[in-house]
Amino acid sequence: DDNDFTNSWLQNRIQTKLYGKHRIKHELKLKGIADDMIDEHLDAHSSDDNEYARAFKLAQGKVGSFEGSDAQRSQRRLSQFLMRRGYSSAIAYRVCKDIFDES
């Protein structure tokens, strides 16, 4: 049923792919799942803290590929990457700030 499918799809995308809420919601809508069911499952599985932690983990793996680029360009590319993966601009900005402040 749709409930079980939504739950398993969401867990796979969160744990394996490290996708953000926006990307997951978009993919589930394309599969024909109702908005209220998507929102219910997203609220149960993902908080802003979890979302930030996943984005940070994803960014740590990606940031090495930007070596040799200037910092501003690297930050822009990393934030665009995170937003394509479904993270909000606020989370992408915060992750980039934290990643590049570490350096």
Report the location of each language-model feature.
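An alpha-helical, amphipathic repeat domain used for nucleic-acid recognition
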Residues: 1-103
